[in-house]
C-alpha cells in the first residue's frame, strides 16, 4: 500500500491509513487498534480534548536530477555515492523510526541524466506512461513536491504531460490527462499568462492522523491538517526563456508566501511546510532573488522549510559550514528560528526535520525550540575511515529496468574515436582537452547557419566559448573524463552535460574583455609575498568559467590582480583586440539570456540566433562528421595562460586523484602533486601550480 493518504475519508478510515507507515497490519489488528483508541464518538471526543504531544518527521529529497539508480551513464558504471535507490532505503528506515512522517520532494527531479533525456527527447514516453523517476518515487509514496528550475528544461507541453495535465498555458492541451507524477505538485510563484492563475496549485492541504502521546502517557491518534506550499527560482524566465516567455510569469517567493500562507491557515492548516527550490543568500531581498531562504523564513505562518537548488547541505556541522549568514544556526538546524533542511543533491542525503508538535485539546502548534533538523547521508565512514554506503532499496531498480537498459543502449551508439584522454581535470589551470571540441562544434554550427541564413552578419568573425561543466564540485568523480579510444554518444553527453541549446550573440571587443574578466572570478586573488598556502580556485562555479580555445584569441589571466583587472594582453589574430570590432560568439541559451553578470548585453538583447538544437547534439554531429578526434586538432589550442609570477608560498588547488599524468600529457609542466588526499572527504587530491612557469 502506498503511504499517500486518501483525502476526504472519514476519521476512522484515515486512522487505518496511518499504520501501514510502520507495519503491514491485517484487518483484525487494525480493528483492534481502532477499538483501543475508542470506537464511539464519546471516547474520541475525550481523547481529543486531552493535551498531547507528537513528533512529525518531514523527510526531504531535493535536486535528484533523475538519478534513480546509483549509475553513471557517462561512464557506464555503478557509482554508490549517489542515487535515489539508496535514499529510498533511508526513507524506509526513517518510517520505521518515526510514527509520523511527511515525505516531500523539492524539485529539479526530471532532468539531469541520459535516462532523463532519453525519455524526454530521444524516445519520448507516451502520455499513458509514467516518467521512470516518478515511477521509482511512487514506490515510496511521496506526500507532495514542488518544481525546480530544471522542470522547465524540456518545455511546457512535456511538463504538462509528466504532471498529468492541467497546465492552462498557450500551446498546451490542458485537458490532456496523462499518467502524471503520483503526488500533489505545488508551486505558488509561477503563473499562467493566459489565466493569470498559478500554473499548478500553489499549495495543498493534507489531512493526516498523527500518532501522539497524551498528557496521561497514553498513545492516541489525532487528526491534523498540514499545508504544503512550493516556490521556485524566478530565474526560469531567463534560463528557459525560449519555452516560457509570454506563457508564464513569476512572483517573488516572499510575495507569494504573504499571499497564500494566510489562505492555508484560513483553510484550517495547523502546520505549514514551505518547499523552497532555492537556498540562502544574505543579499537584500528582491522579487527575482534566486536563493531567498533567509527572507522567506521570516514570513509569518511558515513552520518548517525545506531548501535546495544550491546542491549544498544544511544543517552543516563541519568546521567550515556552507552557510554562516546571520540568522543561520547550523547547530539548531534553523533559519531565523524556523526548522529547515537542505539535503544535498542526486540522492546523496535525506533531509530530516523532526517537528515537535503540541496539541492543546483544540489545535496543533509547533514547538520550534524543541524541533531539530539533520542530514542522513548515504555515504559514511567506518571506524577505520573506509567508505560505507547505504544499501540500495531492492524495490527500485526493477521498476525502471527496461528504460534503464534502453538508455544504456542508446548512449552506447558509436560516433568516432579519440587518440587522447579528454578531461576537465585540469581545465581550471589551462588544459583545453575537453573544451576545445565543444567550441569547435559550436563555432562551425553557428558559422554555417550565418553563411546560409544571416548574410548581414557574414563578415563578422565567429568565435565560441564554453566552460568545464563538470569541475569537481560534487567530488573527485565530478569531472568530464573520456578515455582514449572509441567515442559513443555517452561520451558526448559527458563533454556537454546540460540540455542547453546553441545561441549566437553579437558583441564587440570591449564586451569580450569584460566577459573574460567575469569568467576570471573563478580564481582567488593571489598574494605573491604570502609564505603560506593559497587556494587558487574560488567559489565561483566552474560552469561559469567561459573560455576560448583557439589560436586566434590569446590572453593572460593575472591572478595577483583583483576581480575586474585580470585579463592582460588580449589579442585577436596577433593584434590587440579592437574594443569596437564586432564579433559573433557561439554560446548557449543560459549564457545568452541570463548572463548579465558577465556583460549587460547577455540579457537576450544581443542574441542574433536562438537555434532549436541542443549543444550536446551539435557536438555529437560534429564528431560524426569528424570522427577521428586528435589532441593536435581538437585538444591542444590554449587561448589563455596565467601571467607569470613567482610566489613565496604554494598556490594549490584540488582535482581528481591519480590524475597528474593528465596534466603532464597536456603540457602543464607547472603542475605537481602535493597530497593524494586533500582532506575534503570527496575523493580529491591536492595539487600545486608554479605560476612562474
Protein language model regions, located:
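Acidic, metal/ion-coordinating pockets
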Residues: 44-374, 440-444, 455, 611-614
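C-terminal motif of bacterial Sec signal peptides marking the signal peptidase cleavage site
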Residues: 33-36
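Long, low-complexity, intrinsically disordered N-terminal extensions of eukaryotic proteins, enriched
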Residues: 24-28, 144
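Catalytic centers of hydrolytic enzymes
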Residues: 51-61, 66-96, 134, 139, ...
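Bacterial N-terminal signal peptides that target proteins for export
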Residues: 4-25
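Bacterial signal peptide processing site
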Residues: 38-41
